[in-house]
Protein backbone atom coordinates (compact mmCIF):
# COMPACT_ATOMS: atom_id res chain seq x y z
CA UNK A 1 0.00 0.00 0.00
CA UNK A 2 2.82 2.44 0.93
CA UNK A 3 4.61 1.68 -2.36
CA UNK A 4 1.42 2.41 -4.32
CA UNK A 5 0.98 5.66 -2.42
CA UNK A 6 4.60 6.60 -3.11
CA UNK A 7 4.22 5.89 -6.82
CA UNK A 8 1.07 8.00 -6.93
CA UNK A 9 2.74 10.86 -5.09
CA UNK A 10 5.80 10.68 -7.36
CA UNK A 11 3.59 10.96 -10.44
CA UNK A 12 1.66 13.85 -8.89
CA UNK A 13 4.84 15.77 -8.05
CA UNK A 14 6.30 15.16 -11.51
CA UNK A 15 3.11 16.50 -13.07
CA UNK A 16 3.29 19.58 -10.86
CA UNK A 17 6.95 20.17 -11.76
CA UNK A 18 6.27 19.68 -15.47
CA UNK A 19 3.60 22.37 -15.28
CA UNK A 20 6.12 24.65 -13.57
CA UNK A 21 8.70 23.97 -16.27
CA UNK A 22 6.19 24.92 -18.97
CA UNK A 23 5.28 28.08 -17.06
CA UNK A 24 8.95 29.00 -16.66
CA UNK A 25 9.36 28.84 -20.41
CA UNK A 26 6.60 31.39 -20.87
CA UNK A 27 7.82 33.60 -18.03
CA UNK A 28 11.38 33.76 -19.36
CA UNK A 29 10.25 36.14 -22.09
CA UNK A 30 7.05 37.55 -20.56
CA UNK A 31 6.36 41.26 -20.96
CA UNK A 32 7.53 43.03 -17.76
CA UNK A 33 4.32 45.08 -17.74
CA UNK A 34 2.27 41.91 -17.59
CA UNK A 35 4.28 40.57 -14.66
CA UNK A 36 3.85 43.86 -12.80
CA UNK A 37 0.11 43.85 -13.52
CA UNK A 38 -0.14 40.36 -12.04
CA UNK A 39 1.61 41.48 -8.85
CA UNK A 40 -0.64 44.51 -8.42
CA UNK A 41 -3.76 42.44 -9.09
CA UNK A 42 -2.58 39.87 -6.53
CA UNK A 43 -2.15 42.66 -3.96
CA UNK A 44 -5.74 43.74 -4.54
CA UNK A 45 -6.94 40.14 -4.32
CA UNK A 46 -5.27 39.74 -0.92
CA UNK A 47 -7.23 42.74 0.33
CA UNK A 48 -10.50 41.32 -0.98
CA UNK A 49 -9.78 37.88 0.46
CA UNK A 50 -8.59 39.12 3.85
CA UNK A 51 -11.36 37.42 5.82
CA UNK A 52 -10.75 34.01 4.26
CA UNK A 53 -6.96 34.25 4.55
CA UNK A 54 -7.11 35.25 8.22
CA UNK A 55 -9.66 32.53 8.93
CA UNK A 56 -7.40 29.86 7.43
CA UNK A 57 -4.43 31.31 9.28
CA UNK A 58 -6.33 31.20 12.57
CA UNK A 59 -6.88 27.48 11.99
CA UNK A 60 -3.15 27.01 11.38
CA UNK A 61 -2.23 28.96 14.52
CA UNK A 62 -4.74 27.07 16.66
CA UNK A 63 -3.41 23.72 15.47
CA UNK A 64 0.20 24.78 16.08
CA UNK A 65 -0.64 26.05 19.57
CA UNK A 66 -2.41 22.79 20.37
CA UNK A 67 0.71 20.95 19.20
CA UNK A 68 2.76 22.84 21.80
CA UNK A 69 4.69 25.24 19.56
CA UNK A 70 6.37 28.13 21.41
CA UNK A 71 5.47 31.82 21.27
CA UNK A 72 8.20 32.75 18.78
CA UNK A 73 7.07 30.01 16.40
CA UNK A 74 3.44 31.13 16.68
CA UNK A 75 4.51 34.73 16.00
CA UNK A 76 6.18 33.68 12.74
CA UNK A 77 3.05 31.77 11.75
CA UNK A 78 0.46 34.37 12.69
CA UNK A 79 -1.12 36.79 10.23
CA UNK A 80 -3.23 39.80 11.18
CA UNK A 81 -4.69 42.68 9.14
CA UNK A 82 -1.51 44.74 9.56
CA UNK A 83 0.79 41.93 8.43
CA UNK A 84 -1.51 41.08 5.55
CA UNK A 85 -1.49 44.72 4.45
CA UNK A 86 2.30 44.55 4.61
CA UNK A 87 2.31 41.50 2.34
CA UNK A 88 0.11 43.32 -0.18
CA UNK A 89 2.36 46.39 0.03
CA UNK A 90 5.36 44.16 -0.64
CA UNK A 91 3.73 42.94 -3.86
CA UNK A 92 3.25 46.53 -5.03
CA UNK A 93 6.82 47.36 -4.09
CA UNK A 94 8.18 44.42 -6.09
CA UNK A 95 6.03 45.48 -9.04
CA UNK A 96 7.76 48.86 -8.92
CA UNK A 97 11.29 47.44 -8.95
CA UNK A 98 13.38 47.29 -12.09
CA UNK A 99 13.00 44.02 -13.98
CA UNK A 100 16.38 42.25 -13.97
CA UNK A 101 15.68 40.00 -16.97
CA UNK A 102 17.60 41.12 -20.04
CA UNK A 103 19.81 43.55 -18.13
CA UNK A 104 23.22 43.87 -19.79
CA UNK A 105 25.82 43.55 -17.05
CA UNK A 106 28.90 43.80 -19.28
CA UNK A 107 29.74 44.24 -22.95
CA UNK A 108 32.92 44.38 -25.00
CA UNK A 109 34.29 44.08 -28.50
CA UNK A 110 37.01 41.56 -29.27
CA UNK A 111 39.98 42.46 -31.53
CA UNK A 112 38.51 40.16 -34.19
CA UNK A 113 35.29 42.17 -34.25
CA UNK A 114 33.04 39.87 -32.19
CA UNK A 115 30.51 41.82 -30.09
CA UNK A 116 29.92 40.19 -26.70
CA UNK A 117 27.34 40.96 -24.02
CA UNK A 118 26.47 39.34 -20.70
CA UNK A 119 22.76 39.52 -19.89
CA UNK A 120 20.63 38.39 -16.97
CA UNK A 121 18.26 35.47 -17.53
CA UNK A 122 15.91 33.60 -15.15
CA UNK A 123 17.09 30.49 -13.34
CA UNK A 124 14.00 28.54 -14.44
CA UNK A 125 12.03 26.59 -11.81
CA UNK A 126 12.74 27.39 -8.16
CA UNK A 127 11.61 25.06 -5.37
CA UNK A 128 11.18 26.92 -2.09
CA UNK A 129 11.03 24.73 1.04
CA UNK A 130 10.24 26.62 4.24
CA UNK A 131 8.64 26.36 7.64
CA UNK A 132 5.86 28.26 9.39
CA UNK A 133 6.11 31.57 7.52
CA UNK A 134 3.03 32.26 5.38
CA UNK A 135 4.52 35.56 4.16
CA UNK A 136 7.27 33.59 2.41
CA UNK A 137 4.61 32.06 0.17
CA UNK A 138 3.83 35.45 -1.35
CA UNK A 139 7.33 36.94 -1.21
CA UNK A 140 8.85 33.93 -2.96
CA UNK A 141 6.10 33.73 -5.57
CA UNK A 142 6.38 37.45 -6.30
CA UNK A 143 10.16 37.58 -6.54
CA UNK A 144 10.25 34.50 -8.74
CA UNK A 145 7.57 35.93 -11.02
CA UNK A 146 9.28 39.31 -11.35
CA UNK A 147 12.60 37.62 -12.17
CA UNK A 148 10.96 35.33 -14.75
CA UNK A 149 11.05 32.12 -12.70
CA UNK A 150 8.30 29.65 -11.89
CA UNK A 151 7.96 28.89 -8.18
CA UNK A 152 7.07 25.64 -6.45
CA UNK A 153 6.24 26.53 -2.87
CA UNK A 154 6.55 23.92 -0.13
CA UNK A 155 5.47 25.41 3.21
CA UNK A 156 5.62 23.51 6.47
CA UNK A 157 2.44 21.64 7.31
CA UNK A 158 1.64 24.16 10.07
CA UNK A 159 1.33 26.92 7.45
CA UNK A 160 -0.37 24.95 4.69
CA UNK A 161 -3.90 26.35 5.04
CA UNK A 162 -2.60 29.93 5.16
CA UNK A 163 -0.31 29.36 2.19
CA UNK A 164 -3.04 27.82 0.05
CA UNK A 165 -5.34 30.76 0.80
CA UNK A 166 -2.60 33.25 -0.12
CA UNK A 167 -1.80 31.27 -3.26
CA UNK A 168 -5.43 31.58 -4.36
CA UNK A 169 -5.09 35.36 -4.23
CA UNK A 170 -1.82 35.21 -6.15
CA UNK A 171 -3.41 32.95 -8.77
CA UNK A 172 -6.14 35.55 -9.26
CA UNK A 173 -3.46 38.09 -10.12
CA UNK A 174 -1.83 35.71 -12.60
CA UNK A 175 -5.15 35.02 -14.28
CA UNK A 176 -6.01 38.71 -14.63
CA UNK A 177 -2.64 39.37 -16.26
CA UNK A 178 -2.92 36.39 -18.60
CA UNK A 179 0.07 34.54 -17.15
CA UNK A 180 0.24 30.76 -16.58
CA UNK A 181 -1.49 29.52 -13.44
CA UNK A 182 1.47 27.22 -12.80
CA UNK A 183 3.80 30.21 -12.41
CA UNK A 184 3.39 29.80 -8.64
CA UNK A 185 2.17 26.52 -7.17
CA UNK A 186 1.83 25.46 -3.53
CA UNK A 187 2.42 21.77 -2.92
CA UNK A 188 -1.07 20.80 -1.74
CA UNK A 189 -0.18 17.95 0.61
CA UNK A 190 1.51 17.97 4.04
CA UNK A 191 3.17 14.63 3.22
CA UNK A 192 6.92 15.06 3.73
CA UNK A 193 7.60 12.54 0.97
CA UNK A 194 6.29 15.09 -1.53
CA UNK A 195 9.33 17.25 -0.80
CA UNK A 196 11.71 14.36 -1.39
CA UNK A 197 9.99 13.47 -4.66
CA UNK A 198 10.44 17.05 -5.88
CA UNK A 199 14.08 17.14 -4.80
CA UNK A 200 14.75 14.18 -7.09
CA UNK A 201 13.50 16.03 -10.19
CA UNK A 202 16.74 17.61 -11.35
CA UNK A 203 15.51 17.36 -14.94
CA UNK A 204 12.68 19.80 -14.17
CA UNK A 205 13.75 21.92 -11.19
CA UNK A 206 16.76 24.24 -11.38
CA UNK A 207 17.27 25.32 -7.78
CA UNK A 208 16.05 24.34 -4.31
CA UNK A 209 16.09 26.92 -1.53
CA UNK A 210 15.45 25.57 1.97
CA UNK A 211 14.65 28.22 4.56
CA UNK A 212 14.29 27.09 8.14
CA UNK A 213 15.98 25.28 10.98
CA UNK A 214 19.07 23.06 10.84
CA UNK A 215 17.10 19.81 10.51
CA UNK A 216 15.18 21.13 7.49
CA UNK A 217 18.35 22.39 5.81
CA UNK A 218 20.14 19.09 6.39
CA UNK A 219 17.21 17.02 5.14
CA UNK A 220 17.01 19.01 1.90
CA UNK A 221 20.78 19.07 1.31
CA UNK A 222 21.14 15.33 1.93
CA UNK A 223 18.19 14.23 -0.20
CA UNK A 224 18.39 16.65 -3.12
CA UNK A 225 19.63 15.98 -6.64
CA UNK A 226 18.71 19.57 -7.43
CA UNK A 227 21.33 22.26 -6.63
CA UNK A 228 20.65 23.64 -3.14
CA UNK A 229 21.16 27.21 -1.96
CA UNK A 230 20.99 27.12 1.84
CA UNK A 231 19.32 29.74 3.98
CA UNK A 232 20.82 28.43 7.20
CA UNK A 233 20.37 29.53 10.78
CA UNK A 234 21.30 33.00 11.96
CA UNK A 235 23.68 32.81 14.91
CA UNK A 236 24.22 36.57 14.91
CA UNK A 237 26.66 38.26 17.30
CA UNK A 238 26.79 41.80 18.66
CA UNK A 239 30.28 42.75 19.85
CA UNK A 240 30.68 45.73 22.19
CA UNK A 241 34.20 47.06 21.69
CA UNK A 242 36.12 48.90 24.40
CA UNK A 243 35.03 52.29 23.01
CA UNK A 244 31.35 51.41 22.52
CA UNK A 245 29.02 54.25 23.64
CA UNK A 246 26.86 52.80 26.47
CA UNK A 247 23.51 54.09 25.21
CA UNK A 248 24.20 52.91 21.69
CA UNK A 249 25.15 49.51 23.08
CA UNK A 250 21.82 49.35 24.94
CA UNK A 251 19.83 50.42 21.89
CA UNK A 252 21.44 47.95 19.50
CA UNK A 253 21.27 45.05 21.93
CA UNK A 254 17.58 45.69 22.61
CA UNK A 255 16.68 46.11 18.96
CA UNK A 256 18.66 43.08 17.87
CA UNK A 257 17.23 40.75 20.50
CA UNK A 258 13.78 42.03 21.44
CA UNK A 259 12.11 43.58 18.38
CA UNK A 260 11.45 40.17 16.74
CA UNK A 261 13.38 37.44 18.53
CA UNK A 262 12.02 34.68 16.29
CA UNK A 263 13.68 35.79 13.04
CA UNK A 264 17.02 34.79 11.56
CA UNK A 265 18.65 38.24 11.85
CA UNK A 266 17.92 38.59 15.56
CA UNK A 267 20.98 38.86 17.81
CA UNK A 268 21.72 35.56 19.57
CA UNK A 269 25.00 36.27 21.35
CA UNK A 270 26.46 39.35 23.03
CA UNK A 271 30.26 39.68 23.21
CA UNK A 272 31.81 42.39 25.39
CA UNK A 273 35.42 43.65 25.52
CA UNK A 274 36.88 42.88 28.94
CA UNK A 275 38.16 46.44 29.43
CA UNK A 276 34.63 47.86 29.11
CA UNK A 277 32.57 44.99 30.53
CA UNK A 278 32.17 46.59 33.97
CA UNK A 279 30.82 49.76 32.36
CA UNK A 280 28.74 48.28 29.53
CA UNK A 281 27.28 45.04 30.82
CA UNK A 282 25.16 46.39 33.72
CA UNK A 283 23.09 48.90 31.67
CA UNK A 284 22.82 46.58 28.67
CA UNK A 285 21.97 43.57 30.82
CA UNK A 286 19.43 45.50 32.87
CA UNK A 287 17.63 46.78 29.75
CA UNK A 288 17.51 43.28 28.27
CA UNK A 289 16.35 41.65 31.51
CA UNK A 290 13.64 44.31 31.93
CA UNK A 291 12.47 43.40 28.42
CA UNK A 292 12.07 39.77 29.47
CA UNK A 293 15.30 38.40 28.00
CA UNK A 294 16.97 35.46 29.74
CA UNK A 295 20.72 36.14 29.90
CA UNK A 296 22.89 33.00 29.74
CA UNK A 297 26.35 34.13 30.73
CA UNK A 298 29.92 32.93 30.96
CA UNK A 299 31.44 33.17 34.48
CA UNK A 300 32.89 36.67 34.02
CA UNK A 301 29.69 38.17 32.62
CA UNK A 302 27.62 36.39 35.26
CA UNK A 303 29.72 37.86 38.08
CA UNK A 304 29.45 41.41 36.70
CA UNK A 305 25.69 41.19 36.21
CA UNK A 306 25.03 39.60 39.60
CA UNK A 307 27.00 42.39 41.31
CA UNK A 308 24.85 44.91 39.45
CA UNK A 309 21.66 43.16 40.57
CA UNK A 310 20.75 42.00 37.06
CA UNK A 311 19.05 38.62 36.70
CA UNK A 312 21.22 36.15 34.79
CA UNK A 313 21.96 32.42 34.68
CA UNK A 314 25.09 30.40 33.84
CA UNK A 315 25.46 29.53 30.17
CA UNK A 316 25.51 25.90 29.10
CA UNK A 317 28.29 24.84 26.71
CA UNK A 318 25.89 24.56 23.78
CA UNK A 319 24.41 28.04 24.31
CA UNK A 320 27.24 29.54 22.28
CA UNK A 321 26.59 28.87 18.61
CA UNK A 322 22.88 28.34 19.21
CA UNK A 323 20.02 30.02 17.36
CA UNK A 324 17.46 30.54 20.14
CA UNK A 325 14.73 32.31 18.12
CA UNK A 326 13.38 33.42 21.48
CA UNK A 327 14.03 35.96 24.23
CA UNK A 328 17.25 34.23 25.24
CA UNK A 329 20.73 35.68 24.77
CA UNK A 330 24.14 34.10 25.28
CA UNK A 331 26.63 36.55 26.83
CA UNK A 332 30.42 36.28 26.95
CA UNK A 333 33.23 38.61 27.98
CA UNK A 334 36.18 38.41 25.58
CA UNK A 335 39.72 39.65 26.08
CA UNK A 336 39.68 42.04 23.13
CA UNK A 337 38.81 42.34 19.44
CA UNK A 338 40.94 39.28 18.68
CA UNK A 339 38.86 37.29 21.15
CA UNK A 340 35.64 38.47 19.53
CA UNK A 341 36.90 37.56 16.06
CA UNK A 342 37.99 34.11 17.26
CA UNK A 343 34.62 33.49 18.91
CA UNK A 344 32.69 34.52 15.79
CA UNK A 345 34.93 32.39 13.57
CA UNK A 346 34.13 29.38 15.75
CA UNK A 347 30.43 29.90 16.44
CA UNK A 348 29.10 32.18 13.69
CA UNK A 349 26.83 30.91 10.91
CA UNK A 350 27.97 33.29 8.10
CA UNK A 351 24.76 35.29 8.53
CA UNK A 352 25.13 38.67 10.27
CA UNK A 353 27.71 40.07 12.68
CA UNK A 354 27.81 43.52 14.31
CA UNK A 355 30.27 45.70 16.22
CA UNK A 356 29.61 48.78 18.35
CA UNK A 357 32.70 50.99 18.47
CA UNK A 358 34.07 54.52 18.12
CA UNK A 359 37.43 53.14 16.96
CA UNK A 360 37.65 53.31 13.16
CA UNK A 361 40.57 50.87 13.04
CA UNK A 362 38.57 48.29 15.02
CA UNK A 363 35.56 48.80 12.80
CA UNK A 364 37.55 48.34 9.59
CA UNK A 365 39.32 45.25 10.92
CA UNK A 366 35.99 43.75 11.99
CA UNK A 367 34.56 44.38 8.52
CA UNK A 368 37.62 42.89 6.85
CA UNK A 369 38.05 39.75 8.95
CA UNK A 370 34.54 38.65 9.88
CA UNK A 371 33.14 35.99 7.57
CA UNK A 372 29.43 36.75 7.17
CA UNK A 373 26.96 37.79 4.50
CA UNK A 374 26.52 41.16 6.22
CA UNK A 375 28.78 42.98 8.67
CA UNK A 376 27.30 45.87 10.64
CA UNK A 377 29.17 48.75 12.25
CA UNK A 378 27.11 50.63 14.84
CA UNK A 379 23.90 49.18 13.40
CA UNK A 380 21.59 46.38 14.50
CA UNK A 381 21.84 42.86 13.11
CA UNK A 382 18.17 43.31 12.17
CA UNK A 383 19.23 45.38 9.14
CA UNK A 384 20.35 42.30 7.19
CA UNK A 385 17.10 42.26 5.30
CA UNK A 386 16.31 42.82 1.64
CA UNK A 387 13.92 45.68 2.28
CA UNK A 388 16.20 47.43 4.77
CA UNK A 389 19.17 47.16 2.39
CA UNK A 390 17.16 48.63 -0.47
CA UNK A 391 16.81 45.40 -2.45
CA UNK A 392 13.03 45.24 -2.09
CA UNK A 393 11.59 42.02 -0.73
CA UNK A 394 13.87 39.01 -0.41
CA UNK A 395 13.38 35.32 -0.90
CA UNK A 396 15.63 34.72 2.10
CA UNK A 397 19.16 35.30 3.35
CA UNK A 398 21.65 32.93 1.80
CA UNK A 399 24.50 31.58 3.88
CA UNK A 400 25.84 29.68 0.86
CA UNK A 401 28.65 31.56 -0.84
CA UNK A 402 28.22 30.06 -4.30
CA UNK A 403 25.88 32.02 -6.57
CA UNK A 404 24.43 34.29 -3.86
CA UNK A 405 25.48 35.38 -0.36
CA UNK A 406 23.19 37.41 1.89
CA UNK A 407 19.69 38.71 1.12
CA UNK A 408 18.43 37.26 -2.15
CA UNK A 409 16.54 39.83 -4.16
CA UNK A 410 15.67 39.88 -7.84
CA UNK A 411 19.20 39.90 -9.25
CA UNK A 412 20.11 36.85 -7.15
CA UNK A 413 17.26 34.92 -8.77
CA UNK A 414 18.88 35.26 -12.17
CA UNK A 415 21.99 33.91 -13.82
CA UNK A 416 23.79 35.24 -16.90
CA UNK A 417 24.35 34.14 -20.44
CA UNK A 418 26.65 35.39 -23.18
CA UNK A 419 25.25 36.91 -26.35
CA UNK A 420 27.86 36.83 -29.10
CA UNK A 421 27.36 38.58 -32.45
CA UNK A 422 29.64 38.27 -35.44
CA UNK A 423 29.66 38.63 -39.22
CA UNK A 424 30.38 35.11 -40.34
CA UNK A 425 33.24 34.72 -37.87
CA UNK A 426 34.94 31.32 -37.77
CA UNK A 427 37.67 30.22 -35.43
From Swiss-Prot:
List where in the cell it is found: Cytoplasm
| Molecular function terms from GO | glutamate-5-semialdehyde dehydrogenase activity; NADP binding
Q: Which GO terms describe its cellular component?
A: cytoplasm
Catalytic reactions on record: L-glutamate 5-semialdehyde + phosphate + NADP(+) = L-glutamyl 5-phosphate + NADPH + H(+)
User: According to the lineage, what is the superkingdom?
Assistant: Bacteria
Main subcellular localisation: cytoplasm
| Native source organism of the sequence | Anaeromyxobacter dehalogenans (strain 2CP-C)
Record keywords: Membrane included? no
EC number of the protein? 1.2.1.41
The cross-references to HAMAP family, in alphabetical order and at most eight, read:
ProA
Pathway connected to this protein: Amino-acid biosynthesis; L-proline biosynthesis; L-glutamate 5-semialdehyde from L-glutamate: step 2/2
Q: How is this protein named in the record? A: Gamma-glutamyl phosphate reductase
Membrane-spanning ranges: none
Any one Pfam family here would be: Aldedh
Top EC class per UniProt? oxidoreductase
Amino acid sequence: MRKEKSLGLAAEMRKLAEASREAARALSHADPRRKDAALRAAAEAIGRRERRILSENARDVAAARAAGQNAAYLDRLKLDPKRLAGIAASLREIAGLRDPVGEVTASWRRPNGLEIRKVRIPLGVVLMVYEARPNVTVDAAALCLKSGNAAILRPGSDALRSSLALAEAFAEGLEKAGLPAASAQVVPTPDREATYELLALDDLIDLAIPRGGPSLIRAVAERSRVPVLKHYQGVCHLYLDASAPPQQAVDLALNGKVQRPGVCNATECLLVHRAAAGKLLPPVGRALADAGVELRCDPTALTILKRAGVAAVPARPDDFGKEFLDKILAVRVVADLDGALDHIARYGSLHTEAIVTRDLASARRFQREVDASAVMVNASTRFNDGGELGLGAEIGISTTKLHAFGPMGLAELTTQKFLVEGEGHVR
